[in-house]
UniProtKB/Swiss-Prot annotation:
Residues 21-128 form the PH domain. Keywords: Cytoplasm, Developmental protein, Membrane. The gene is PLEKHB1. The keyword Cytoplasm applies. The lineage of its organism: Eukaryota, Metazoa, Chordata, Craniata, Vertebrata. This is Pleckstrin homology domain-containing family B member 1. It comes from Homo sapiens. One of its GO terms (cellular component) is cytoplasm. It is found in: Membrane; Cytoplasm.
Amino acid sequence: MSPAAPVPPDSALESPFEEMALVRGGWLWRQSSILRRWKRNWFALWLDGTLGYYHDETAQDEEDRVLIHFNVRDIKIGPECHDVQPPEGRSRDGLLTVNLREGGRLHLCAETKDDALAWKTALLEANSTPAPAGATVPPRSRRVCSKVRCVTRSWSPCKVERRIWVRVYSPYQDYYEVVPPNAHEATYVRSYYGPPYAGPGVTHVIVREDPCYSAGAPLAMGMLAGAATGAALGSLMWSPCWF
């Protein structure tokens, strides 16, 4: 009797996370850093120690990705989160505040207290556990939206070359977009995993390295150049008052 032929996998069961090093995924509420509004995103914790959040569970349109590995100072949940209010209709027991070593902070909210505790455990483990060799992680992507069409640009987590990025906050989409430098827009610039820095009326351009390298020096030079430009413009605006 010949052995039975193997049954092909059902295409309906295929997942976008197949053969990818996904540690944990699920829906969480995220508070934006500028307007302090709550938005529901699909979060994916990858085995390389990064936490990405997306528009839906297909993980095709990534809004941003945060470095967790060796970058978490502490995580507070529930009543420990004193300086944040939960989304409307949600319990305070589901709150999570992730304090990063680089100065950033994530305010999240899970559906239940148990879900919040499970996320805290997974994040702390990702913070202290090195990624195994050969782990496959999807490339990082950003959506660049123009007035005519939308395209997606992707890059690998760690490459040697340096790139210049300008990140503009979109109040309509409630996240940062990577766009070419535009002198007619107020551009908000931040370090890749750090808090935003705003310079009203001045376009800031910095040299951003990949996460494997420090971006402190280019960021400092960019902020210094922006401050000097702002001071020069201010002196020109007040110069008519001297005559």
